[in-house]
C-alpha cells in the first residue's frame, strides 16, 4: 500500500493561503462543520487525536464536533454515526470500529452529501477512490502504517529477547482493521527469526482484565515464555498486569502498541519494556486539513501516513520523545 507522507504544517499553510486566494465561495465566506467520531471517547489515543484535530480546526476557522461511544463497538458507534449524519455536517472523520459493519451507514452519509474520511481505522481494504468494490467511496484514509508498526514491534521484541524463545500476540478481536494489520506485520517480521516461536494469538475483547488472565494462562502452559506484543492499549496494559501478577518482570518482555501515560508508567515500573507510539495528534490534524482541502475544491490524496516513535526506559524522559506521549 502506497503511503503519502505530507508535512502537516506546510499543508495547513498552503490551505490558509488558498483561502485568501479563493473567490466569493471560498472558506472565508462559509463556515464549515466537521464531525470527528473516534473509535471510543475514553482512550488517550483518540483524546490526543481530538486535540490535533481541534488545532487544525482553530487555524482554519472550522467548527469541529467530537462525538463517540464509550466502547470500541460497532453496535454503539453506528447510532452515534446516524445521529451525526442527521445533523448534516459538511464532513465526517471517523475511526470505524469494524471494517465491514460500518460500510453501509457510511455509504448513507456519503449519499446524503457528507464527505467521508476515515482516520486510524478503515473500511473494506482501505483502498479508496479506486472505482472498485463497495467500500472505496471515502475520500481518504489517514493513519499510521499498521503493518509497518507491527514489524517495528516484532524487531524490538526480537532484540529484547535475544532473538530466541516463545512469544504471542495479545489482540482485541478479529476484523478490526488496525489491529489485524499490526498482528499481520508482527508475524510477517517474526518469520525472519527462526529461533522465535509465535504462539496462538489471544483475543481479549478490549478487556485488560481478560488480557491479564490470558497472560497468566499462557505463562502457566509455557514457563519459557519470552515475550508478548500487546496490539493496542488494553491488550498491552493487561499483559503488563499479568506479568506483574506473575512476578515475571524482566523474564517476559512486553512490547506495547500506543503510548498513553499509563503505558509510560508501566515502562518506568519495569512492567512494559517498549512502546510503539503512534502520532494521533498528526492524524487528527491531517484529517481536518484534508477535509477542509476537499471542501474548498482541492484534490486530496486517498492515503496519508503518519509515523512512529519507539519509547523505552532509555529515552522516556527525552523532551523529543515525551511530546509523542498521548494526552489523558
Protein language model features and the residues they cover:
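A residue-level marker of the well-folded mature domains of exported/periplasmic proteins
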Residues: 26-328
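Basic/polar N-terminal segments that are highly enriched at the extreme N-terminus
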Residues: 1-3, 19-28
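Bacterial N-terminal signal peptides that target proteins for export
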Residues: 1-11
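Bacterial N-terminal signal peptides
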Residues: 9-20
Amino acid at each position: 500500500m502506497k503511503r503519502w507522507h505530507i508535512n502537516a504544517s506546510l499543508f495547513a499553510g498552503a490551505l490558509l493561503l488558498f483561502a485568501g486566494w479563493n473567490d466569493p465561495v471560498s472558506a472565508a465566506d462559509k463556515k464549515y462543520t466537521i464531525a470527528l467520531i473516534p473509535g471510543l471517547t475514553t482512550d488517550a489515543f483518540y483524546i490526543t487525536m481530538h486535540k490535533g484535530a481541534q488545532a487544525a480546526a482553530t487555524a482554519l476557522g472550522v467548527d469541529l464536533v467530537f462525538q463517540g461511544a464509550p466502547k470500541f463497538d460497532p453496535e454503539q458507534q453506528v447510532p452515534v454515526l446516524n445521529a451525526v449524519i442527521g445533523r448534516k455536517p459538511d464532513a465526517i472523520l471517523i475511526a470505524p470500529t469494524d471494517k465491514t459493519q460500518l460500510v453501509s451507514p457510511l455509504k448513507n452519509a456519503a449519499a446524503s452529501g457528507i464527505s467521508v474520511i476515515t482516520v486510524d481505522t478503515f473500511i473494506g481494504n482501505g483502498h479508496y477512490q479506486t472505482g472498485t468494490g463497495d467500500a472505496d467511496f471515502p475520500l481518504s484514509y489517514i493513519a499510521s502504517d499498521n503493518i509497518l508498526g507491527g514489524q517495528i514491534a516484532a524487531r524490538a521484541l526480537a532484540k529484547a529477547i535475544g532473538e530466541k524463545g516463545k512469544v504471542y500476540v495479545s489482540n482485541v478481536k478479529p476484523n478490526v482493521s488496525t489491529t489485524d494489520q499490526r498482528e499481520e506485520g508482527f508475524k510477517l517480521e517474526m518469520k525472519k527469526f527462526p529461533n522465535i516461536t509465535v504462539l496462538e494469538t489471544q483475543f481479549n475483547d478490549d478487556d485488560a482484565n481478560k488480557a491479564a488472565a490470558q497472560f497468566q494462562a499462557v505463562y502457566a502452559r509455557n514457563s519459557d515464555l519470552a515475550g508478548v506484543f500487546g496490539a493496542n492499549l488494553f491488550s498491552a496494559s493487561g499483559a503488563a498486569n499479568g506479568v506483574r501478577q506473575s512476578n515475571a518482570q524482566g523474564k517476559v518482555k512486553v512490547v506495547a502498541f500506543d503510548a498513553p501515560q499509563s503505558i509510560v508508567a508501566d515502562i518506568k515500573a519495569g512492567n512494559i519494556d517498549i512502546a510503539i507510539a503512534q502520532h494521533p495528534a498528526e492524524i487528527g490534524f491531517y484529517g481536518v486539513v484534508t477535509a477542509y482541502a476537499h471542501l474548498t475544491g482541492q484534490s486530496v490524496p486517498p492515503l496519508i501516513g503518519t509515523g512512529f516513535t519507539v519509547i523505552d526506559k532509555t529515552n522516556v524522559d527525552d523532551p523529543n520523545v515525551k511530546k509523542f506521549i498521548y494526552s489523558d
